[in-house]
Design a protein with these regions (language model features):
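A gly/proline- and charged-residue-enriched helix-loop-helix capping module
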Residues: 48-96
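Short, solvent-exposed loop/turn segments at the edges of secondary structure
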Residues: 48-50, 116, 311
Length: 320
């Protein structure tokens, strides 16, 4: 996943004291595992600046050695003056192969406690469930309005002046300020920096009302009604941000957008032009607040209406 790439982690290096680790086996020079992490006082967190962290291993990782590895990590952290570890485990949909040896080690070696459980909604692309009535009704409204969708190409000469990005970011910010009295985790400038570093992995998809000819003969610009920022991380397409304007919400803009994404952009693999395309899952992201204690029922209803079902994002803690 590109989230563990230095080009992504370092965009907010001023906010986190890096404590990431490269792990090699004794007597072997090959890299065995990675652990993105930062330190805050006497606490290690993997990772506070990411949706998830956790141990990243290859096919050589086996249960007994991963248990031994956590024993050595704990000893190393104690020697560094660390007294607490916060571990945001990688959800299983991001694994290229089964790799939950770390979770076993957390309970058996670290005696960790599950402190946060949040729920996301994910679609298995090759086995989609039926779309709900609400999404179907929204799609009919959008088609009646003749709405269109497009994937925004990265234009380095535009950067923060890209009209599609600016329009979407205003919609997103307005929604967050109005509903949650907060702002996006990223600024538009930060997001465009990341898009420039990972143009194939971070994409913006928008739904819009096409330009129309006015009575005086002039043409109005396309009106952006909603969109989503997509993170393409190996086999998972993850929606990092989703937003629609009040007008977009009233005319089914997001219903149109996700219908287009799931059926035209990321169809079942047997329908794809590039057969080796690895994408397996479409993840709508979490629908919880307050460390998982509050479930946003209207938000998860919309995601489940497209056939999304639960994948948990878990956080563990233990004392040293």
């Amino acid at each position: 996943t590109f989230l563990f790439n230095r080009g992504y982690l370092d965009y907010h290096s001023d906010r986190f004291q890096d404590a990431s680790l490269l792990i090699r086996r004794h007597g072997k020079g090959r890299l065995y595992a990675l652990l993105p992490a930062h330190r805050k006082g006497g606490t290690i967190c993997s990772h506070g600046g990411l949706t998830y962290g956790g141990l990243l291993t290859g096919s050589e990782a086996k249960a007994a050695y991963v248990c031994k590895l956590f024993e050595e990590l704990n000893a190393y952290w104690r020697a560094q003056g660390i007294h607490k570890v916060v571990y945001k485990a990688m959800p299983w949909i991001y694994h290229r192969q089964p790799a939950q040896e770390d979770l076993y080690a957390l309970t058996q070696i670290c005696h960790a406690s599950l402190t946060v459980r949040e729920i996301s909604s994910t679609i298995l692309i090759d086995s989609k469930l039926k779309v709900g009535d609400s999404a179907k009704n929204g799609l009919r409204k959008a088609r009646k309005r003749n709405l269109r969708c497009r994937m925004v190409d990265y234009r380095p000469e535009k950067q923060c002046d890209d009209p599609d990005w600016k329009a979407f970011w205003k919609i997103l910010t307005d929604n967050l300020v109005m509903v949650h009295h907060t702002h996006p985790v990223h600024t538009l400038e930060e997001m465009m920096l990341l898009v420039g570093r990972f143009p194939e992995a971070i994409r913006l998809a928008v739904v819009y009302e096409p330009e129309t000819q006015q009575p005086d003969g002039t043409c109005s610009d396309d009106v952006i009604l909603g969109g989503t920022v997509l993170y393409l991380t190996g086999q998972v397409v993850h929606t990092q941000y989703i937003a629609a304007s009040p007008e977009g919400k009233s005319c089914g803009a997001l219903d149109m957008l996700f219908h287009w994404l799931l059926n035209d952009c990321f169809p079942e693999r047997q329908q794809r032009c590039v057969k080796e395309d690895p994408i397996l899952y479409f993840d709508f992201g979490k629908s919880t607040e307050d460390a998982g204690h509050y479930l946003n029922s209207s938000l998860i209803f919309q995601k489940e209406g497209f056939g999304g079902r639960g994948v948990c994002y878990d956080t563990y803690e233990w004392e040293l």
